[in-house]
Amino acid sequence: MAQVGDKLPNVNITVIDKEGQKSVAANEYFAGKKAVLFALPGAFTPTCSETHLPGFVVHYDDITGKGVDAVACLSVNDAFVMKAWQDTQNAEKIAMVADGGGALTKALDLVLDTADFGGTRSRRYSMILDDGVITHLNLEKGGDFEVSGADTILKQLG
C-alpha cells in the first residue's frame, strides 16, 4: 500500500487540465511539481459530488497560494466521464485524472472493491506530492470522509 516516501509509479493516466486532455505517465505528470492529488470512488456519486470535490474547488486558490503547482482529482472513471463531471462541478482549475482501468490505483494498492456498486474503484484519499514523492497521505477507512478533504490539506501545507 502507498505510504509517505513512495514515488508515484510509471503507469499511464489520462489528465484533463487547462492544457487539454493527454495520456501521460503519472510519475512524469507530477515530476518537478508540488502537487495535491485526491482520489474518490466515483464521479457523480453523492459524497464525491456534494462535498469532496467541491471543497477543493472552493479552496483551490488557498491551496495554490501555499506554493502548490497543481491540484488533481483521480477516479477510476473514463476521461469522458471525468470531463463531464469537471464541467458540471465548475472544476476547470482542478486537473481531472481518469484512471480508467485503475492502473495507478492498483499500482498504489489503494483499490476499493465495490463489486455491488461499480467494480474496482479507488479508495478515498488525499496526498501531497513533491516531485512525484508522497510527503503526506490521508487515507480514509471504508466509505468514510473524515481526513481527505481540502481542510486537512490546507493544515498540512501550513
Language model features with spans:
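Chalcogenol-based redox active-site neighborhoods
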Residues: 1-158
